[in-house]
Amino acid sequence: MRLDKYLCDALGATRKQATKIIKSGEVLVDGEVQKSGSFKVPEGGVVEWDGREVGAPGPRYIMLYKPADFVCSHEDGYNPTAFVLLDEPKVENLHFAGRLDVDTTGLVLITDDGQWSHRITSPKHKCKKTYRVWLADAIQPDYVEKFAQGIELRNEREATLPAHLEIVNEAENEVLLTIVEGKYHQVKRMFAALGNKVELLHRERIGDIVLDDTLEPGDYRYLTQEEVDSVWN
C-alpha cells in the first residue's frame, strides 16, 4: 500500500494532509525516514509518525471503561455520548457492540467490524455478560435458584434464560450476575421482578473479554488479538 494511502486510512486524514505529514520528514517506515507518498509500505512494515507507531489500517476493536452519565449512541439531546471519550479518527464509523444504560458503568466494546459485533449482540450466540450489582435491599436466600430457573419479567411472554448469580458481599447487598441475553434494562427488571432495586450496576465482562483493571473511568485501549479472536470461539 502507498504510504499516503496508509496514513489516510490509519489517521482518517485527507490526501493533502497525509502528503504534508510525509513531507515534514517525521514519518518513518521500519526506522527509516520516507518523504514520498508513493513509497510502498511492505507487508508487516512498522510506520511511525512523530515518534509514535501508526496502526495498520483495518478494523478497530476498542475496550472503553464507560463512566456514568454518558450514553452509548452517536447523538443524544441530554447526555454526552461516550464517543467523545475517544481520541480516534473517523469516530462516526464506529459503533457499540452492546450498549449500557446512561447510569451504568463499566466495559463497553466499540468497533467498526459489523460481523464481529453481531457475534456479541445476536441472541442466538448467547454471549455471556457479567455485571457487578449493588442492591437496595437484602439478598434473599432463594435468589440464586430463581435466577438459575429464569425470571418472569413484566410485559414479556417468556421468562429470561437461566442466569448465574453469585453472592459477593451479603452485608453490602453485592452480587455478580451473568446473563446471556440483552433485553431492555434486563438486569434492573430481573431484580425488580423479585421486589428489589438495583442501586449501582457495573459491567465487568463480555464473553472472555474482561475490563482492564488498569483503566480508569473514561479511559480506553485497543483489544489484543487474543481478545478479538475470543469472540469467534
Swiss-Prot record:
Classification via Gene3D superfamilies: Alpha-L RNA-binding motif, Pseudouridine synthase I, catalytic domain, N-terminal subdomain, RNA-binding S4 domain
Domain S4 RNA-binding: from-to ranges: 1-67
Gene Ontology biological process terms in this record: enzyme-directed rRNA pseudouridine synthesis
E.C. number: 5.4.99.19
Alphabetized InterPro entries for the sequence: PsdUridine_s_RsuA/RluB/E/F_cat (IPR042092), PsdUridine_synth_cat_dom_sf (IPR020103), PsdUridine_synth_RsuA/RluA (IPR006145), PsdUridine_synth_RsuA/RluB/E/F (IPR000748), PsdUridine_synth_RsuA/RluB_CS (IPR018496), RsuA_PseudoU_synthase (IPR050343), S4_RNA-bd (IPR002942), S4_RNA-bd_sf (IPR036986)
Catalytic-site annotation from UniProt: 101 (nucleophile)
Key words of the record: Isomerase, RNA-binding, rRNA processing
Catalytic reactions of this protein: uridine(516) in 16S rRNA = pseudouridine(516) in 16S rRNA
Enzyme class per UniProt: isomerase
Keyword field contains Protein biosynthesis: no
Family recorded in the similarity comment: Belongs to the pseudouridine synthase RsuA family.
PANTHER family linked: PSEUDOURIDINE SYNTHASE, PSEUDOURIDINE SYNTHASE FAMILY PROTEIN-RELATED
Function: Responsible for synthesis of pseudouridine from uracil-516 in 16S ribosomal RNA.
Designated name of the protein: Ribosomal small subunit pseudouridine synthase A
Organism from which the protein derives: Vibrio parahaemolyticus serotype O3:K6 (strain RIMD 2210633)
Taxon lineage: Bacteria, Pseudomonadati, Pseudomonadota, Gammaproteobacteria, Vibrionales
